[in-house]
Amino acid sequence: MATKLFVNLPVKDLGRSKAFFTSLGLDFFGQTDDMASVIVSEHTQVMLLAEPTFASYARNGVADAAAHTEMILVLGVETREQVDALADQAQAAGGEPVGAPRDDGWRYQRGFTDLDGHHWEALCLIEPAS
């Protein structure tokens, strides 16, 4: 059984993308000229790959994330304040908001894009009052 998850994303400018994710408070594990690995958690990393490198692995070409949503990546945090802080940091670093914040009683989330148009969400699951 697999014990780790590696999500691979194409990026146009690895240096700018690394600065964007650093501004969100995320750390990196290793980097080459065409790849940097963002540590999301102990068992999850997002591999930022320069587009030509990503294309060498892709069977069907590279999707234009600015024109099509290829996936939605969700970062789970503990509090509403952390959701707001993460989304605000993303916007301050050049990301764009996606939709309005969602608050339906059991979850609170805000969406944003990274510099390459990949759709991210910051999410807090709210414990019901006892």
Indicate residue ranges for each PLM-predicted region.
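Short, conserved charged micro-motifs
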Residues: R16, R80-A85
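Short amphipathic alpha-helices in soluble, non-transmembrane regions
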Residues: F20-S23, L86-A90
